[in-house]
A protein has these predicted regions:
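Membrane-interface loop-to-helix entry segments
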Residues: 122, 135-190, 221, 244-248, ...
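A generic transmembrane alpha-helix motif of multi-pass inner-membrane proteins
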Residues: 181-182, 363-367, 371-379, 408-468
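Helix-loop-helix junctions that connect adjacent transmembrane segments
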Residues: 9-16, 55, 130-133, 164-295
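Membrane-interface "cap" regions at the ends of multi-pass membrane proteins
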Residues: 1-43, 47-52, 66, 70, ...
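C-terminal membrane-solvent junction of multi-pass transporters and transport-like membrane proteins
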Residues: 162-163, 329-340, 380-433, 463-468
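Transmembrane helix-loop boundary segments of multi-pass membrane transporters
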Residues: 44-50, 119-135, 154-164, 276-279, ...
């Protein structure tokens, strides 16, 4: 990177094809953040920090997400690549070791997330059809999603578009139902909004919001998929600037309104028992079949998350193969322009979900979620750092200014905000209930990956020649 770098090539390398369109990108990122973390996981913050604290925590996490999206948007418009921040880390981090480490960490986290999502979907389907064991549903869903992803990126995009549309429709319906419920309750003199209860805004103290953030932030992670998809999107430098801000604002709007409804009507003193607060609101709003409706929505959310996991993990492995961080076979594509071997190895490892034949599904799901830990925060920190280094490189003349097709606002404060807040959230995780387990699991993975780097690292001179 000693000479002025010009615009990257218009077409992706390695056989990938630009089959994704703007609507795929928008719905993929929008639906990617609406999952079981919102539908079920929100019960825990509501109980621990109260409705007002939960609303503040989600709005703050949404702000971090929007700032991260802006940083990623600048990088993806300049260098559309399916490896996203892993490839950018190779370009802008002082040592390729971090690109190698975050790439493998992120891939493993998606593989475990895939197994967890398959377990969740299988468990939900088992509740509807008790005669069929959980592991059989896991296998069937995995085979179907693998076949879809092996066809083309467009097939993945269409599948994800409609699965995400179901979730978005459920959120809109929930907001409308909650609005009707609030309007009807306003006529009763004995009704009081639950936003402030027992004379307190924060039942267990405002400091619990910091601990709550460690749960809340994971609900938004996955939105960085837009960076992976940029490498297979038509005219990414034109589409991405239009999509980035729209995605962020829509997510904050949907989350904000949905949580505001819960904050006004959902009793915070209810102990989390596995039931979705959304089901509680639908039931009390008088909508028949609310339990079945939300069960189907949560099932589609789990399948959607599994679909995204196959896509994200396979593209990350494809990128690392191109950067000589993984075997070259994972960089090969089929006639549909998809990395076939990367998809197959991801699906093969996800068969760990079949262990639900021997381990209770709910317990196994928690094990897998704990294994993913803080990788999402590390990915967001990497995005903020790379955007900061890229903008500095443009200023000192290393890269041409015409690469700034989209400018992240408030530089350098946006990047600094992303880095500092995500680091603080990682530290806050240590004080959560599962913090020690998460920290130890992630530390073990990181040490193992770092050891493999020093044992099998490629020739750096050859590696550097592939970047730019």
């Amino acid at each position: 990177m000693d000479t002025l770098q010009q615009s990257p090539p218009a077409e992706p390398e390695g056989g990938l094809r630009r089959n994704l369109k703007k609507r795929h990108l928008l719905m993929m990122s929008l639906g990617g953040t609406i999952g079981t973390g919102l539908f079920i996981g929100i019960a825990e913050p509501l109980s621990n920090v109260g409705p007002a604290g939960t609303l503040l925590a989600y709005l703050f996490a949404g702000t971090i997400m929007l700032a991260t999206m802006m940083c990623l948007g600048e990088l993806s418009c300049a260098f559309p690549h399916s490896g996203s921040f892993q490839h950018y880390a190779l370009m802008f981090m002082p040592s390729p070791c971090w690109s190698y480490t975050i790439g493998w960490l992120y891939w493993f986290s998606w593989v475990f997330s895939l197994a967890a999502d398959l377990t969740a979907a299988g468990f939900i389907a088992h509740q509807l059809f008790p005669a069929v064991p959980v592991y059989m549903f896991c296998l069937a869903i995995l085979l179907i999603l693998t076949a879809i992803n092996l066809t083309s990126a467009k097939s993945f995009g269409e599948c994800e578009y409609w699965l995400s549309a179901i979730k978005v429709f459920a959120i809109v319906l929930f907001i409308c139902a909650g609005g009707v419920m609030i309007y009807s309750l306003m006529g009763h003199s004995d009704w009081h909004p639950t936003l402030k209860t027992d004379g307190m805004w924060f039942p267990h103290g405002w400091e619990q919001i910091v601990v709550c953030m460690t749960i809340v932030i994971y609900s938004f992670q996955g939105v960085e998929l837009v960076g992976n998809a940029a490498g297979e999107t038509e005219s990414p430098h034109i589409i991405l600037p239009k999509v980035i801000l729209g995605i962020g604002l829509r997510i904050i709007l949907f989350y904000g309104l949905a949580i505001a409804v819960l904050a006004l009507v959902y009793p915070h003193e209810l102990t989390p028992n596995g039931q979705s607060p959304f089901v509680w609101v639908f039931s009390h709003a008088g909508i028949p079949g609310a339990d079945t409706l939300m069960t189907l929505v949560i099932f589609s959310a789990a399948v959607s998350a599994a679909n995204s996991a196959i896509y994200a993990s396979s593209r990350m492995l494809w990128s690392m193969a191109g950067d000589r961080f993984a075997p070259a076979c994972f960089g090969k594509t089929n006639g549909g322009g998809v990395p076939v071997y990367a998809i197959l190895i991801t699906a093969l490892l996800a068969l760990v979900s079949l262990l639900t034949r021997y381990i209770p599904a709910q317990q196994f799901y928690l094990y897998l979620i704990a294994s993913t830990g803080q990788v999402g925060c590390l990915a967001w920190i990497t995005i903020g750092w790379c955007q900061y280094r890229f903008r500095q490189s443009v200023r000192n003349g290393t890269y041409a200014s015409d690469l700034l097709r989209y400018r992240s606002p408030l530089f350098p404060w946006t990047a600094r905000f992303v880095i500092i807040t995500n680091f603080a959230i990682m530290v806050g995780t240590w004080f959560s209930e599962q913090g020690v387990v998460i920290m130890l699991v992630e530390l073990a993975f990181m040490i193992g990956i770092l050891l493999s780097w020093y044992l099998f690292r490629p020739t750096l001179s050859r590696l550097r020649n592939t970047v730019g």
